[in-house]
Amino acid sequence: MTTTSVDSWLCSSHGMHFITNYSDQASQNFSGVPNVTSCPMDEKLLSTVLTTFYSVIFLVGLVGNIIALYVFLGIHRKRNSIQIYLLNVAVADLLLIFCLPFRIMYHINQNKWTLGVILCKVVGTLFYMNMYISIILLGFISLDRYIKINRSIQQRRAITTKQSIYVCCIVWTVALAGFLTMIILTLKKGGHNSTMCFHYRDRHNAKGEAIFNFVLVVMFWLIFLLIILSYIKIGKNLLRISKRRSKFPNSGKYATTARNSFIVLIIFTICFVPYHAFRFIYISSQLNVSSCYWKEIIHKTNEIMLVFSSFNSCLDPVMYFLMSSNIRKIMCQLLFRRFQSEASRSESTSEFKPGHSLHDLSVTVKMPQYSTKGN
């Protein structure tokens, strides 16, 4: 979450240089010369790749999550706990997607940030905040499904709709408190005229931030372990029920639900595991003295892994469709109404010829009726 803090970077005609230092403003706040190391780095290819992928993620994710929100808000009946969680995940995904245009413009502008250190911190923190909100809520979704499927009928309502609302409120409150804390600390520290954002930085004198990032990584792996255990248990129980009720007409739905559960697990693994597996190396390199070659590899790898995490905002709408039968029904109803309205519109336009009014048509229809009476 804090990896987007602005450092001092150096641009030259020979390529992009990034400067690692012991303090963001050591050269301004101390009379001594800061211990800095200039590392040449060519980011033209990386910027092109990031711009392309973030643009695709922005367009697809924006459309998908707006449709998802429309569907969630279109559920007029009482929402269950799963739908409450999914609604909040969609909101978090949209907020993350709204951060992507800033990253896109930054890379298009040859990695030059012109909007100030405060907005850089706001955009970067919002990006990571909403990513971890999604991860936490997906963990609660897996726990909720495990309880509802694996417990007895009397205990299926262990997590009620009201409790899920409380959980979401707590998650958002803690996240917003952390977000405001980061912004306040940035304001107290004071800004500088750096034109760089979203990049690698050393944390030799900022071990507290490194520890905080490490805690987030540990939290992710605990949630990931919870999701794995939950969906494996869910899948086994559903497949066992499907075999027991193989003669019933609806026995196939249990096997389908089990497969969908593993698809959700696969989506989560593809998007978040590579990034968080690499985070241990990334954080360690920030605390230790590393060569310029190693820092360049770490920086570029981290940016690519972050693209995978962002891609989750495109795949979450697919997960919504797989996890909730009500959402599938509403989506089918919306599509049916859309096609029905298009069909009725085309039929109505085909009945009228260009140049004829509705009155002219009614006259031509009535004329044969008068002639038959005359006969």
UniProtKB/Swiss-Prot annotation:
User: So which stretches are on the Cytoplasmic side?
Assistant: 76-81, 143-164, 231-262, 325-375
Q: What broad class describes the main subcellular location of this protein?
A: membrane
Which residues does the entry place in the Extracellular compartment?
Answer: 1-54, 103-121, 186-209, 284-303
Q: Can you name one GO molecular function term for this protein?
A: G protein-coupled receptor activity
Q: Name one GO cellular component term.
A: plasma membrane
What PANTHER family does this protein map onto?
A: G-PROTEIN COUPLED RECEPTOR 34-RELATED, P2Y PURINOCEPTOR-RELATED G-PROTEIN COUPLED RECEPTOR
- What name does UniProt use for this protein? Probable G-protein coupled receptor 34
Give the organism the record lists. Mus musculus (Mouse)
